[in-house]
């Protein structure tokens, strides 16, 4: 039980800006085990968003959507948005070359492509949130962060790490590979409790995952922390849009 709790705390500290403080820096093995808790972190984010949406009942949908999106970004500390921005710059500037793409992803500066992609993704999220709230479907909000963070263990389990060294490789090398399929099966299966909406969200998640993973492999031969972050953001966006249509 103590190890399970520590794994959850490591995952919360890594994926969110919630005030979680550990007594010592987690080991690579602990970072690897924490991947089991990524779906649960997504559930917790979703519950916070749902509770916030309910507390804002009666607020105009556009303002409510803006406040929820701001909270959403704050909860993750824009961690995954940063990965999306880096990947967008690298995918365009890399000109199809693996080494050039990896080099651009390490550059902390953001170019115009990154800015445009971030604006478009946030605009789509905002619009989809406003539509869902206007339809009285706030109860579906947890599906987006939940399934997006469930896709991370699937990515790490099925895709080699493209860049030697760093935290990403340490996580990849210490994945609890035997337990992950069970965790993923439960996480994806529970999404079906949302009925047809859950089935739609799950199908969108898996289809987008398969397509993005194929792009990562074709360009990089694997994944990186930035592409993992981009996967989260794009999955959240796609699920929200699909549910709002």
UniProtKB/Swiss-Prot annotation:
Family in the record: Belongs to the CobS family.
EC number: 2.7.8.26
Record keyword Transmembrane helix present: yes
Cofactor field: Mg(2+)
Protein name as catalogued: Adenosylcobinamide-GDP ribazoletransferase
Transmembrane segments: 31-51, 61-81, 113-133, 138-158, 192-212
Keywords per UniProt: Cell inner membrane, Cell membrane, Cobalamin biosynthesis, Magnesium, Membrane, Transferase, Transmembrane, Transmembrane helix
A Pfam family the protein falls into: CobS
Highest taxon in the source lineage: Bacteria
Bilayer topology term: Multi-pass membrane protein
Coiled coil (residue ranges): none
GO molecular function: adenosylcobinamide-GDP ribazoletransferase activity; cobalamin 5'-phosphate synthase activity
Associated pathway: Cofactor biosynthesis; adenosylcobalamin biosynthesis; adenosylcobalamin from cob(II)yrinate a,c-diamide: step 7/7
Gene: cobS
GO annotation terms (biological process): cobalamin biosynthetic process
Reaction(s) this enzyme catalyzes, per UniProt: alpha-ribazole + adenosylcob(III)inamide-GDP = adenosylcob(III)alamin + GMP + H(+); alpha-ribazole 5'-phosphate + adenosylcob(III)inamide-GDP = adenosylcob(III)alamin 5'-phosphate + GMP + H(+)
Task of the protein: Joins adenosylcobinamide-GDP and alpha-ribazole to generate adenosylcobalamin (Ado-cobalamin). Also synthesizes adenosylcobalamin 5'-phosphate from adenosylcobinamide-GDP and alpha-ribazole 5'-phosphate.
GO cellular component, one term: plasma membrane
EC top class named in words: transferase
Compartments where found: Cell inner membrane
